[in-house]
Amino acid sequence: MAQFAYTPQAWATLIQTPQDRAAASDTLLRHFGGRLIGLYYTPGAEYDGFALFEAPSDATAAAVEIADIALGHLRSNRLLRVLSAEEMRAALQQAAAAPNIAPKAAG
C-alpha cells in the first residue's frame, strides 16, 4: 500500500483537468508486473489518498514508488507492507517460537 500527498501544482492540474488517476496508477503498476487493487482518497487527512496494490516483490513495489515520485506530482509518499490475515497468523506463529532475550532482573 502506498499513501500519497499531491503537490499544490498537481491539485491545480487535477482541478483544471479532472482525470482518472486510478487508470494511470494501474498502467505504471502493470509496467512493473503488478496491479492496482484500488485507489482511494482521504481529503483532510495527513495524506491525500492511498493506493492498494500488488507487486511481484517488495523491491518492485519500491521501484514503482520511486518511479512515481520522480514524476514530481507528489509532495510526500509512504510505502507500507500490508499483511493478509493468513500472513499475520504465520508471523505470529513464527514469533511464538522466538527465544526469550528480554533483560533479566538482578537478583
PLM regions: where:
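Short beta-strand-to-loop capping motifs
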Residues: 4-6, 51-56
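An amphipathic, aromatic/His-enriched active-site/gating alpha helix that lines ligand/cofactor pockets
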Residues: 54-86
